[in-house]
């Protein structure tokens, strides 16, 4: 049975050109809609510079290129050359700077000033031109973890084109508290018109991108501790092009009894997650969630014809769902884990099926990190690697079958394992290596380094368990982290030296900072343009701009853009959710890999012709 085709966004070739010491590095997309035999001719200044079509990669080093050169690429199918792509001018360095309209700070009701810094971002094509726009969250300097009292500044959401053109700003208002657990924003084409929408939790006083107020503009539900434990809660879908509110419904589930969520002061009640999933296998649905320490509720919606229609509700308080309480993480993942072509929600140590029924619960409980992908390519299907917080549970680290919940192996820790990573970092071992560490980053001696089969290959694991990134030209994944001095983080990309058991820094740009304190997150990591390698975005020290860094390493490996992989693309959508986690692919990408399967997709909207 052929899988259903999934709705996907229209993308151009994403051609980029970067000046290097050896010449001009040129890179472009191989699309999920391309035939596997598609090859490419490259043009410089209107003249073809390739004698034969390039068939084995989608990058090229033009040793005769200059800083003033202009490039185009054309696909070649069955000997016939297609239209030329959009023109690409040469970057002088491997970075694109996106200027920002930094907002002014303010003063809280108790007289304390605050400023803003650029925080999490997502991307989507909000105008249908095949190029990504940036949706950015501004974080006030007084943003709070839920465990802490205090007023916060207002959360702002901006939209920019990648040339820095400011498009609109949404102000979530005084009745949305600032912090990693409060605002999770989904950027995705939810209705299939070829243009992405933005969906997130709102409240009385939220101002949309057109200046319209949602609810009661004068309402102020903050208590003396700066918390918001009463008043209406909403879910709003905004038009991507303008930031205009398209529809607003009551946020489900409502607060109910504070104690149901795990405490009596509003900490665990206000733990929100969000994701996008193809619950019918063809079109995306919005999934909004509340709670994971005890009560856990997920609600799925379809956005069609300008309205939100509820698809299902999963509530751990429902009879028969008791085993699903207290299993969620500070993040989630989305993938078809049971092979039926429809997505499931992997919610920490549990999973919810595409139809809103419980798929399984391992009972191992809450954790701070989780990775879902083809971690063990010798097995059929996907796996989940997770670290766990409850010292009384049998495992502090576990690897399970993503579809059944079967624990394949685990490691007893007897303590809260704070961070964990799964990535193919050593070509000597097929599949991912996995490890857990305790922040702020010890050497992993307490848990060790394991293969996906559970073989302990070293007492010493990498000290980094933050993000993994495909950066250089081989199939081994690098690690993305930062140097933390107690107040700020200096981002870096490192490569694992298995022979010497250490990390070696291969890229560390100046003038940029990491996000989210000790977590060291980028603004966003995603395959934004060029070939299949990933870009990474960090903020400048003063948050006056974002800097998008791309690799200039040549590679002979050729895959379709990761943004056309179903698991990876949805990973970009949920990356901003709470404790940011890196995206993974639906297939094993690493040493000894098989050729990735061609994704089953169709292009949404009016741009269904072959992209340029």
Curated annotation (Swiss-Prot):
Ca(2+) 10 binds at residues 527, 529, 531, 533, 535. Divalent metal cations. Has highest activity with Mn(2+), followed by Zn(2+) and Co(2+). Binds 10 calcium ions. The calcium may have a structural role. Substrate binds at residues 119, 139, 154, 174, 205, 222, 419, 516-518, 579. Optimum temperature is 60 degrees Celsius. Ca(2+) 4 binds at residues 330, 366, 368, 389. One of its GO terms (molecular function) is lyase activity. GO terms for cellular component: extracellular region. Its EC number is 4.2.2.24. Its cofactor is Mn(2+); Zn(2+); Co(2+); Ca(2+). Ca(2+) 8 binds at residues 472, 474, 476, 478. This is Rhamnogalacturonan exolyase YesX. It comes from Bacillus subtilis (strain 168). The gene is yesX.
């Amino acid at each position: 049975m052929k899988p259903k085709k999934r709705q996907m966004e229209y993308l151009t070739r994403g051609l980029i050109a970067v000046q290097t010491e050896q010449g001009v590095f040129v890179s472009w997309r191989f699309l999920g809609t391309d035939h596997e035999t598609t090859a490419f001719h490259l043009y410089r200044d209107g003249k073809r510079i390739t004698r034969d079509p390039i068939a084995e990669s989608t990058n090229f080093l033009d040793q005769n290129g200059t800083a003033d050169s202009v490039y185009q690429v054309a696909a070649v199918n069955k000997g016939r050359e297609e239209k030329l792509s959009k023109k690409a001018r040469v970057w002088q360095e491997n970075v694109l700077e996106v200027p920002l309209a930094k907002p002014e700070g303010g003063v809280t009701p108790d007289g304390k000033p605050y400023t803003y810094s650029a925080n999490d971002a997502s991307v989507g094509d909000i105008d249908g031109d095949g190029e990504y726009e940036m949706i950015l969250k501004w974080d006030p300097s007084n943003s709070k973890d839920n465990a802490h009292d205090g007023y916060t500044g207002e959360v702002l959401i901006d939209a920019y084109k990648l040339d820095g053109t400011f498009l609109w700003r949404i102000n979530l208002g005084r009745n949305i508290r600032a912090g990693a657990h409060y605002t999770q924003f989904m950027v995705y084409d939810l209705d299939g018109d070829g243009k992405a929408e933005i969906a997130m939790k709102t409240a009385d006083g939220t101002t949309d991108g057109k200046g319209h107020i949602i609810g009661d503009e004068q309402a102020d539900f903050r208590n003396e501790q700066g918390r918001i434990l009463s008043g209406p809660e909403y879910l709003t879908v905004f038009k991507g092009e303008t930031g205009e509110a398209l529809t607003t419904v009551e946020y489900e589930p409502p607060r109910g009894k504070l104690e149901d969520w795990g405490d009596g002061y509003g900490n665990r009640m206000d733990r929100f997650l969000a994701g996008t999933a193809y619950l019918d296998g063809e079109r995306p649905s919005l999934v909004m969630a509340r709670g994971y320490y005890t009560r856990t509720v997920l609600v799925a919606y379809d956005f069609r014809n300008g309205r939100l229609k509820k698809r299902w509700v999963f509530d751990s308080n429902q009879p028969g769902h008791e085993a699903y309480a207290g299993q969620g993480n500070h993040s989630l993942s989305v993938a078809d884990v049971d092979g039926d072509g429809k997505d499931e929600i992997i919610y920490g140590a549990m999973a919810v099926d595409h139809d809103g029924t419980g798929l399984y619960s391992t009972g191992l409980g809450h954790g701070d990190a989780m990775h879902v992908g083809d971690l063990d390519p010798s097995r059929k299907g996907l796996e989940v690697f997770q670290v766990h917080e409850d010292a009384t549970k049998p495992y502090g680290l576990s690897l399970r079958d993503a579809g059944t919940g079967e624990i394949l192996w685990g490691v007893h820790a007897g303590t809260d394992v704070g961070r964990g990573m799964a990535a193919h970092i050593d070509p000597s071992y097929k599949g991912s290596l996995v490890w857990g560490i305790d922040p702020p980053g010890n050497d992993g001696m307490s848990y060790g380094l394991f293969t996906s089969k559970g073989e302990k290959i070293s007492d010493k694991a990498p000290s980094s368990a933050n993000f993994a990134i495909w950066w250089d030209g081989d199939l081994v994944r690098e690690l993305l982290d930062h140097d933390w001095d107690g107040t700020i983080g200096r981002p870096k990309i490192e490569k694992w030296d298995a022979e010497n058991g250490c990390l070696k820094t291969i890229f560390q740009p100046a003038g940029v900072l990491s996000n989210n304190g000790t977590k060291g997150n980028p603004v966003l990591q995603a395959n934004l343009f060029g070939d299949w390698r990933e870009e990474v975005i960090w903020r400048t020290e003063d948050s006056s701009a974002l800097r998008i860094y791309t690799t200039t390493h040549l590679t002979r490996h050729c895959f379709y853009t990761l943004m056309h992989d179903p698991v990876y693309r949805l990973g970009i959508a949920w990356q901003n959710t709470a404790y940011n986690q890196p995206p993974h692919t639906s297939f094993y990408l690493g040493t000894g890999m098989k050729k990735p399967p061609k994704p089953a997709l169709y292009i949404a909207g009016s741009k269904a012709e072959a992209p340029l």
